[in-house]
Amino acid sequence: MEAITFTARKHPFPNEVSVDFGLQLVGSLPVHSLTTMPMLPWVVAEVRRLSGQCSKKEPRTKQVRLWVSPSGLRCEPDLEKSQPWDPLICSSIFECKPQRVHKLIHNSHDPSYFACLIKEDAAHRQSLCYVFKADDQTKVPEIISSIRQAGKIARQEELRCPSEFDDTFAKKFEVLFCGRVTVAHKKAPPALIDECIEKFNHVSCGRRTDWEAPTGQPSAPGPRPMRKSFSQPGLRSLAFRKEFQDASLRSSTFSSFDNDIENHLIGGHNVVQPTDMEENRTMLFTIGQSEVYLISPDTKKIALEKNFKEISFCSQGIRHVDHFGFICRECSGGGSGGFHFVCYVFQCTNEALVDEIMMTLKQAFTVAAVQQTAKAPAQLCEGCPLQGLHKLCERIEGMNSSKTKLELQKHLTTLTNQEQATIFEEVQKLRPRNEQRENELIISFLRCLYEEKQKEHSHTGEPKQTLQVAAENIGSDLPPSASRFRLDSLKNRAKRSLTESLESILSRGNKARGLQDHSASVDLDSSTSSTLSNTSKELSMGDKEAFPVSETSFKLLGSSDDLSSDSEGHIAEESALLSPQQAFRRRANTLSHFPVECPAPPEPAQSSPGVSQRKLMRYHSVSTETPHERNVDHLPGGESQGCPGQPSAPPPPRLNPSASSPNFFKYLKHNSSGEQSGNAVPKSVSYRNALRKKLHSSSSVPNFLKFLAPVDENNTCDFKNTNRDFESKANHLGDTDGTPVKTRRHSWRQQIFLRVATPQKACDSPSRYEDYSELGELPPRSPLEPVCEDGPFGPVQEEKRKTSRELRELWKKAILQQILLLRMEKENQKLQASENDLLNKRLKLDYEEITPCLKEVTTVWEKMLSTPGRSKIKFDMEKVHSAVGQGVPRHHRGEIWKFLAEQFHLKHPFPSKQQPKDVPYKELLKKLTSQQHAILIDLGRTFPTHPYFSAQLGAGQLSLYNILKAYSLLDQEVGYCQGLSFVAGILLLHMSEEEAFKMLKFLMFDMGLRKQYRPDMIILQIQMYQLSRLLHDYHRDLYNHLEEHEIGPSLYAAPWFLTVFASQFPLGFVARVFDMIFLQGSEVIFKVALSLLGSHKPLILQHENLETIVDFIKNTLPNLGLVQMEKTISQVFEMDIAKQLQAYEVEYHVLQEELIESSPLSDNQRMEKLEKTNSSLRKQNLDLLEQLQVANARIQSLEATVEKLLTSESKLKQAALTLEVERSALLQMVEELRRQSARPSTPEPDCTQLEPTGD
């Protein structure tokens, strides 16, 4: 037996910068993970005390080596240099990640000691405290700094590089997307899925009827044309109006569920909208560790991505058991910040797959919840036992021994008599030498006591019944100390409840004040941060009272509930379901704009002495009124101009009907002295900031503008109203479109400001009003109003109105520019697409070429490929054979394979009887396959190192999935077999997805590869026998060597046949094998296998056991050199073993029959074998009949060709005779002409009268 040898790694972090320190390990102690920094000095003292109590035989401290690096923290014994490293003896003391070190302490009394607290078990909340001593106390800060820096780097790496397990261990299922449903609540009855499916079918049938109806007839009122959802491509929406009543729905029967859902469906314009049947609705439903993905194999993109926290409900159909759906939260459109609940409905191939999906979802939710709970940081509440110990350690920190002892005695009185007696007895047993040692012992026993209590403690607010039961069981027989302790706890609870009550009262007062301030006045110059902080407190108090946390248990019928249990998610969900008015009232102090759907503006609140209103003074603002105009504003009788309360809708400003009330005049009077009007419109904070920046940024603003009269900041009429205040009173309520243009005067101060501060802009430039867009859609200011000037400066030039011709030219120019931009964008998209295609092709063909193709050979291939109508032209096969032997250019290989397939079809015009149905590729992709699990598993195994297929569910894997899925649907007998993914992958690397599918059909049906993938695998057994016979005939010594060690071809050659060498050999070699398969057929695989084994025969014969021989053939033999590969390819071109393969196949069947006849069997066994033989013979007869039919068809076609050739030959002979007669007649005429030319005296004969003699 050979000895087991291994090499131990001395340095644990060789690839990173690691630091090691020589230290003395004083000891360790398990403590609770809630141990705080004030407790740690007492823990260190306990560890040192326990270390001092060790026996004399054992050393008090242990020499260790501490290795620190960002990837780990490792402590191992420090051996002497003479002692050898033995991994069986010298195991590490502890090893952990540096981010698990959550506390470090340096002892100030003894600087050579330090301790670290390491999280060991997050589930049981256990930590370990290790205490070290350094020989040089000056190095302790360096050690602590190194550990902290390593933890910091490790945490940054975790954030930078997220976990890769989500995609690796994700479960994938193929589903058919049925439709999308908008529901009113995050819960739904189990019958929701069935009702949605029925509605989908009903609407689809109605739409189909509408499409089939003639266009001339008026269409009946029915569902509107289907529209896509804005959130996801190809997803449709259905709305539910009312909320589902969870309690009643769960207690009712299924029939009541049906009626309830029927009542919740919206009629009218919002109708059921299922998906488009013409689109490819198949999706890959991927369940990760914390998310659910919906990937479209057609578009190669993620169609939907939802976190587990967003999914609130999962359910399977009751009547439609092959359907399921889940409800999730989605953001509402329009940027309003709200959300709604959407149910997605899917279909699977069968019920078993739906059950598996539901079980996987439930397990994923459970695991994610456990992980989230484990990751949640442990916190102390006011009632925690360790919190009392923490406060005690804080109080005694820095005290001398005597004062510490007094504090400890006071604290011990709060314990029960039994606990006090136990601690006193334990301390007296150990006989402390001094007060300090006695204090350490008391703290140690208190820590143990409180840690035991902490295990049974439930934090404040957690629904745990143990504390309630314990509180109820407290009797009157408790000692006085315990009663005092109980009294203190009750007082603490009373304080907390009183504080919470006061805070809730104050929050309600803040809400009322916020509503009153909204309707009366808003302090726009107050601090935004203070407002936000106050409002956040108000929301945190008010919302928690208003919305109780709903239960989060799993539902019946395999349904799963919401994973997130935090109150914030429920608060956000419930607040979104409120009316806009309620939401608006709650956030009146913080929102910088009104909600979009506010039904009515809030009425102005009456001024009360209890509510103080701040003054709003803008001393740096510019007044747009003269003193005379301000006096006019305050005339009695309701003539004063005021700005209305602005609702969310944008009507033009109008006078408030209550403007004539006495209170309204009071507000106007206050407004003249700087206070806001009761109807003032609160403006956006961003608008005010922008306006202040605009004014403050101008360095030329004169100082005297500070002393101008303050202007109401809420008066939007000053900004966008085109008329003066005293002039707008008469026509403000009328139609402003028909009024003539009024003049508006600027004061001479305003003219100075407009000319000095912004001289480059006209006074009525639209840019002055860009920052007012958040006020609402008020009537725009007209650029045609002339401005009269009453100051010392001249009139300001107004912009002239453009003529219709100029406007037409501007429109024409804008349209032409837009057309040009669109064309340029299209060209850019085309260029980007072509660039992506080139990059994709380069990525696919990223392999080393075996036989470099010369330029002359490439020219020959390009000439043949560019021949017009090449699919109908037969090329010389000797020329094609020679070209393939000389090499195939890599960038033309896919096109050459299609060319060879076309030549095969021309050579064999009558295909075999087993041709598949001609179903379009796109139609196959729209169906679900039952082979999805096997295909999805093999996707990650197919060329895992190639960049095109390496990405999990990337473009390469999705295209490969589409091809394999389509073939499994096309060929139901074969379906999917392991090995097909490599064949399809090789094809996909050299051509497009649909072309690769066509070539896969050609290889399977025309080239005969389909037989070896049948479920019975009989053809594969025959192929193994044929390979053994070839070895026996061509390489007898190698065959004997393999038989001697009982190595059959199935141990090493099965993947060669099933994957066509693609799973083990380099891609360049496999591509050359495919070149020859397209040219010669499936017998090329035998030739390549025989050539490989024969060329490596000397090396195989050197190995003398089964393991080494098989390992050499599987691992060493595929790593061929370029020379050996070229030699193998050239040998394959010279081989011809077709007759041998046919003879070996017949031999296999004969031997099989002989073995069946010779073996003594019972009657039943003989009957079964005869039946199997009969069925196999029938199959062979059918195959022979097919071959006979093909041969007869070929014979008939050849006979017809011969007949055609004979008839054409007779016609050609007759034509030849006719031409011969005509030729002889012409020759006679030429002779006659020569004779006549020899006799010049005689008259020339008339050539027109000459006729050919004879026939």
Curated annotation (Swiss-Prot):
Domain PID, first and last residues per copy: 238-398
Skewed-composition ranges (Low complexity): 519-539
Tissue: Expressed in highest levels in hematopoietic cells, testis and kidney.
Any one Gene Ontology molecular-function term assigned to this protein's record: GTPase activator activity
Residues of the signal peptide: none
This protein's record includes keyword Phosphoprotein: yes
Region called Disordered, residue ranges: 208-228, 509-544, 559-581, 595-614, 621-681, 764-786, 1233-1255
Record flagged with keyword Nucleotide-binding: no
Phosphothreonine: residues carrying this PTM: 499, 590, 1218
Keyword terms of this UniProt record: GTPase activation, Nucleus, Phosphoprotein
Subcellular location: Nucleus
PANTHER family, alphabetized: RAB GTPASE-ACTIVATING PROTEIN 1-LIKE (PTHR47219), TBC1 DOMAIN FAMILY MEMBER 1 ISOFORM X1 (PTHR47219:SF18)
Main function: May act as a GTPase-activating protein for Rab family protein(s). May play a role in the cell cycle and differentiation of various tissues. Involved in the trafficking and translocation of GLUT4-containing vesicles and insulin-stimulated glucose uptake into cells.
Name of the protein this chain belongs to: TBC1 domain family member 1
Lineage: Eukaryota, Metazoa, Chordata, Craniata, Vertebrata
